Curated annotation (Swiss-Prot):
Native organism: Dehalococcoides mccartyi (strain ATCC BAA-2266 / KCTC 15142 / 195)
The protein's assembly and partners: Part of the ribosomal stalk of the 50S ribosomal subunit. The N-terminus interacts with L11 and the large rRNA to form the base of the stalk. The C-terminus forms an elongated spine to which L12 dimers bind in a sequential fashion forming a multimeric L10(L12)X complex.
Superkingdom field: Bacteria
Job description of the protein: Forms part of the ribosomal stalk, playing a central role in the interaction of the ribosome with GTP-bound translation factors.
Keyword list, A-Z: Ribonucleoprotein, Ribosomal protein, RNA-binding, rRNA-binding
Name recorded for this polypeptide: Large ribosomal subunit protein uL10
A single BP term in Gene Ontology: translation
Length: 176
């Protein structure tokens, strides 16, 4: 019996270690007073955005943090803690949770977050949530890069277009 419990805890630590290792960012929440249906709704919204959400056992979470290069986040694991994390979009966990909290009367509390190998405050999580998503930022950069190229193409085509107009006018002059 004790072996099975230890085995389950080891599996839980390994899974959490993997989650922490790939997480680009994380938001920590205090889920006291949350009903199961509300927690399910939160999980569903996070999952739709590609964000994982785990309720953590603090001791196991600290062990998992020790197994990664994120050992500095151990202080976040106090009280009832759940973690929303993403391996692809840094903004998504903060944005989804803050949008949910703004549109509901939930008792869920954001207690802090993790970004770029450091803990961030609740205020910094709120600021992070205001940033556009990764896809929007990439499209803005690409649009900014495309504008000068399009302008250059227009400038380079200008003399050729002018020459074509002059030649066409000369042809009409010779015909008529």
């Amino acid at each position: 019996m004790v072996k099975k419990i230890r085995e389950k805890k080891k599996i839980a630590v390994d899974e959490l270690t993997d989650a922490l290792a790939v997480a680009q960012s994380a938001v920590f929440t205090d889920y006291r007073g949350i009903s199961t249906s509300e927690l399910t709704t939160i999980r569903m919204k996070l999952r739709e955005a590609g964000v994982g959400y785990r309720v953590l056992k603090n001791t196991l979470a600290r062990r998992a943090a020790d197994n990664t290069d994120h050992a500095n986040i151990k202080s976040a694991f106090e009280g009832p803690v759940a973690m929303a994390y993403s391996s692809s979009d840094v903004v998504a966990p903060a944005k989804v949770l803050m949008d949910y909290l703004a549109g509901s009367k939930s008792t869920l509390k954001v207690t802090g977050g993790y970004l770029s190998n450091k803990l961030i405050s609740v205020e910094e999580v709120a600021e992070l949530a205001k940033l556009p998503s990764r896809e929007v930022l990439i499209s803005k950069v690409l649009a900014g890069m495309q504008s000068p190229i399009a302008g250059l193409a227009m400038v380079l085509n200008g003399p050729a277009r002018g020459l074509a107009v002059v030649l066409q006018a000369r042809m009409k002059q010779l015909e008529g």
